[in-house]
């Protein structure tokens, strides 16, 4: 299993719109997301992702077998999703 560590760029962290964009992109990938030493959760579950309480500037770890999905999701989190049209 591979991992990617990402600093959250969205001003509101992974709440509301950024969480929806992220979890939609993560659907079907099998990727998990964790904040700090917390237990990883399914990255496609908006409720579980929002429950992590990830804020702007926090570091999260993505894990999974699909390298391409990990890269895409890491790039997504590294952008300010609040600023996306």
Feature names for model-found ranges:
Residues 7-47, 51-54, 64:
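Compact, glycine-rich, soluble single-domain proteins
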Residues 51-85:
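C-terminal structural segments of small proteins and small subunits
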Residues 1-5, 59:
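Intrinsic-disorder/low-complexity, polar/charged segments enriched in Ser/Thr/Lys/Arg/Asp/Glu/Gln
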